[in-house]
């Protein structure tokens, strides 16, 4: 059962696109639209991903920022994440206006992270590539990878754990440390088929 209706997913992708374009072109932060569905004012975690169109998945990423925890109303979090993905992702220079025609927008709405219990060596059996995203925390370090990432890169569960450790700035075997907390979550993902094109629900498998 989906939490996010297809039309809500399309609304969020269009909103994220408008937030990016208005900020990149005019440095203007848009307000949530008056016709925002009531349900999208609920607090939820969300990530916005900007991808270069017609580029292999491993090379397409142009920016991805979001909020793992439900701390903002979804409509507000989507606007914030979209702008941050465009101009504040430390891995990339800010998006320029001339790039906007070549970027597709993807919105991932997250379930709250759930702690993976049990001995560390059993963690790969408790997650599933094609369903789960991962959040890893140890001390001051944390890293998150969305559910679509291991699918796009062809990873198995152990590699997914190792890559999330690396994303957190930790050794790739940190998931075997009992002091490392591993959380899993799922996401409903909506994407433009091409820049400013139709919006579809993205299948993971």
From Swiss-Prot:
PANTHER family: AMME SYNDROME CANDIDATE GENE 1 PROTEIN (PTHR13016:SF0), AMMECR1 HOMOLOG (PTHR13016)
Alphabetical list of PROSITE patterns matching this protein: AMMECR1
Organism: Thermococcus kodakarensis (strain ATCC BAA-918 / JCM 12380 / KOD1)
Disulphide linkage map: none
Pfam family, one: AMMECR1
InterPro entries registered for this protein in UniProt: AMMECR1, AMMECR1_dom_sf, AMMECR1_domain, AMMECR1_N, AmmeMemoSam_A, Uncharacterised_MJ0810
NCBIfam families, A to Z: AmmeMemoSam_A, PRK00801.1, TIGR00296 family protein
Domain annotation AMMECR1: ranges: 7-201
Top-level lineage group: Archaea
Protein name: Protein TK0174
HAMAP family referenced in this protein's UniProt entry, alphabetically: AMMECR1 (MF_00645)
């Amino acid at each position: 059962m989906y939490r996010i209706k297809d039309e809500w997913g399309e609304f969020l992708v269009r909103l994220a696109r408008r937030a990016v374009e208005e900020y990149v072109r005019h440095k203007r932060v848009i307000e949530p639209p008056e016709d925002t569905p009531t349900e999208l004012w609920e607090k939820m975690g969300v990530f916005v991903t900007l991808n270069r169109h017609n580029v292999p998945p491993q090379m397409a990423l142009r920016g991805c920022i979001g909020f793992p925890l439900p701390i903002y109303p979804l409509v507000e979090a989507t606007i914030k994440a979209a702008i941050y993905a465009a101009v504040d992702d430390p891995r990339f220079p800010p998006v320029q206006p001339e790039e906007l025609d070549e970027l597709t927008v993807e919105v991932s709405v997250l379930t709250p992270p759930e702690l993976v219990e049990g001995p560390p060596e059993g963690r790969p059996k408790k997650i599933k590539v094609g369903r789960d995203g991962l959040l890893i925390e140890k001390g001051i370090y944390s890293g998150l990878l969305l559910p679509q990432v291991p699918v796009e890169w062809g990873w198995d569960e152990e590699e997914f754990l190792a890559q999330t450790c690396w994303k957190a700035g930790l050794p790739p075997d940190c998931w075997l440390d009992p002091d490392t907390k591993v959380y899993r979550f799922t996401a409903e993902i909506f994407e433009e088929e091409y820049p400013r094109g139709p919006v579809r629900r993205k299948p993971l498998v």
